[in-house]
Amino acid sequence: MKRVNCFILTLILLFGFAVSVAAEGESIRITYAGANLPEIVVNAQTDNMDIDCQDVTLNFDGKTVNASSAEKYDKSKHSRRVFFLLDLSTSMKVQYFTSAKECIADFADNMGENTTVYLITFGKDVSCVLDGSNDAGEIKSVLSTLSNNQGGTKFFAAIKQAMDISDTCPMADMEYAVVFSDGEDFQTGDTTQKEVEDKIGKSAMPIYAMRAETGRVSASDIGIFRSLVAESHGKMYSYSTENAVEVFDDLNSETASQYIIHADTGNNVFNGLSQLSLIHISEPTRLRCIS
């Protein structure tokens, strides 16, 4: 692996808006950034590069802040919060739905003691059926009660609810959501696409997709799903009934290979603003600041 020579992150105080400004650096993708001032945590995905904390400099409110640590994610050490969003609509087909539950159950068996799981289901209704658990038995017990028998798919509302819950949670070293769905929203008037896009624009949580290739969803709906994932700085994966476990393993490898970067601003003053923006090499990432 080659070492990163220059990695500059710029944090700018904003009123909840992202700004497209480039900074210097190499091929690094920022997936998550959060703050509980004076502490800041950043998740960084690299293209086969090493990151050392000496390589990382942050500019916070006009002041230079050096990283105190930059480590590869370690489930035995770093805290992780994961939201699983599971589509209960009949359009998912039983085989795809069963594969999704098996993926989540396998994750629970191997997640480590520092991971907290939330499970949100959506069909004609949206429900948080698991409100933060580290108990694999509890997670699998809840999964066993679920079936894909609902008409309608409140896809947008489920994503918004996950981000709303995230906003109330303490900062974690890593946080992301995984949506198991074919990606179509049949329910209008509850939460709109624009509302979700606006929420993503003010959120720091990446959304990853496990899209079921059922063949029932239009190219337009798949495009909407893909754009929401990209806007959140997540990534879309597509699975069939034959390869769901392998595809989900790839997603887990992607998230587990990230660097966890910590920095300390030296004070907890942020002028009463609840949102910060992270500007870096190629794309903006929101930094959620907890007062």
Residue spans for each PLM region:
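Von Willebrand factor
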Residues: 75-131, 137-180, 211-221, 246-247
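Bacterial N-terminal signal peptides
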Residues: 8-16
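Single conserved hydrophobic/aromatic residue that forms the stacking wall/gate
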Residues: 280-291
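VWA/integrin I-like adhesion module and closely mimicked acidic/polar interface patches used
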Residues: 181-231, 248-251
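DG-centered beta-turn motif at the end of beta-strands
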Residues: 56, 87, 100, 119-122, ...
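Acidic, polar low-complexity linker/tail segments
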Residues: 23, 28-83, 88-97
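C-terminal helix of von Willebrand factor
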Residues: 220-221, 228-276
